[in-house]
UniProtKB/Swiss-Prot annotation:
It is found in: Cytoplasm. PANTHER family: PHOSPHOHEPTOSE ISOMERASE, SEDOHEPTULOSE 7-PHOSPHATE ISOMERASE / DNAA INITIATOR-ASSOCIATING FACTOR FOR REPLICATION INITIATION. Pathway: Carbohydrate biosynthesis; D-glycero-D-manno-heptose 7-phosphate biosynthesis; D-glycero-alpha-D-manno-heptose 7-phosphate and D-glycero-beta-D-manno-heptose 7-phosphate from sedoheptulose 7-phosphate: step 1/1. One of its GO terms (cellular component) is cytoplasm. Catalyzes the isomerization of sedoheptulose 7-phosphate in D-glycero-D-manno-heptose 7-phosphate. Its cofactor is Zn(2+). It catalyses: 2 D-sedoheptulose 7-phosphate = D-glycero-alpha-D-manno-heptose 7-phosphate + D-glycero-beta-D-manno-heptose 7-phosphate. Its EC number is 5.3.1.28. This is Phosphoheptose isomerase.
Length: 193
C-alpha cells in the first residue's frame, strides 16, 4: 500500500546523507566543532544550545546526552539547552520572542563558553541574536544550518551546513546524526585529557 512511498522517503534520506558526505569539509567541520567543545569543557567552560521547533528539540537532545549519557557511562559535561519555559515565556512577553535565546546568553554565557545555534534555514532571528550575544560575551559559536546557510552563514567559528534545499526534515535528520557524532568525539577528546 505505502511501500513505494516508504522506499522513496528512505532513499531521499540516504541521498541527502551521501551528498553531505561527499564534501570533505563537512567531516573536518564536525571534527573542529568537537575539539572546540571539548577544549571549552577542559578549561571549565560550558555549552549553551538553542533552536526553534525541531531544532529546539535537537538542542535539548544535545544537552541531555552531554549531561546525562550517550553510549557509555562517564562524568556529565556542562551543557544547557535554552529551554526553560518560564524564561522563554517571560522574555517573549516582556521583550519579544526574538530575544528568548540572547537574553539567556547575556545572563549566563561567559568567555570560554560555546554556543551551539541550530537552524535548518539559517534565518532564525532569535538564534542570530543569540550568536550576536555570544560574540559580545567572548564565546565561541558553532552552527548547524541547512540550505545555503541563510543569514547565519559565516557567523560561526565552525558552521556545519547541510546543503539540502527540500523539506527541513531531511536537514534535521543529518543534524541529529552530527549531534551524536559530536558527543562521541567529545567523549574521546575528554578521555585524552
Amino acid at each position: 500500500m505505502y511501500q513505494d512511498l516508504i522506499r522513496n522517503e528512505l532513499n531521499e534520506a540516504a541521498e541527502t546523507l551521501a551528498n553531505f558526505l561527499q564534501d570533505e569539509a563537512n567531516i573536518h567541520a564536525i571534527q573542529r566543532a568537537a575539539v572546540l567543545l571539548a577544549d571549552s569543557f577542559k578549561a571549565g567552560g560550558k555549552v549553551l544550545s538553542c533552536g526553534n521547533g525541531g531544532s529546539h528539540c535537537d538542542a535539548m537532545h544535545f544537552a541531555e546526552e552531554l549531561t546525562g549519557r550517550y553510549r557509555e557511562n562517564r562524568p556529565g559535561y556542562p551543557a544547557i539547552a535554552i529551554s526553560d519555559v518560564s524564561h522563554l515565556s517571560c522574555v517573549s512577553n516582556d521583550f519579544g520572542y526574538e530575544y528568548v535565546f540572547s537574553r539567556y546568553v547575556e545572563s549566563v554565557g561567559r568567555a570560554g563558553d560555546v554556543l551551539l545555534g541550530i537552524s535548518t534555514s539559517g534565518n532564525s532571528g532569535n538564534v542570530i541574536k543569540a550568536i550576536e550575544a555570544a560574540r559580545a560575551q567572548g564565546m565561541k559559536v558553532i552552527t548547524l544550518t541547512g540550505k545555503d546557510g541563510g543569514k547565519m552563514a559565516g557567523s560561526a567559528d565552525v558552521e556545519i551546513r547541510v546543503p539540502h534545499f527540500g523539506y527541513a526534515d531531511r536537514i534535521q535528520e543529518i543534524h541529529i546524526k552530527v549531534i551524536h557524532i559530536l558527543i562521541m568525539l567529545i567523549e574521546k577528546e575528554m578521555v585524552k585529557g
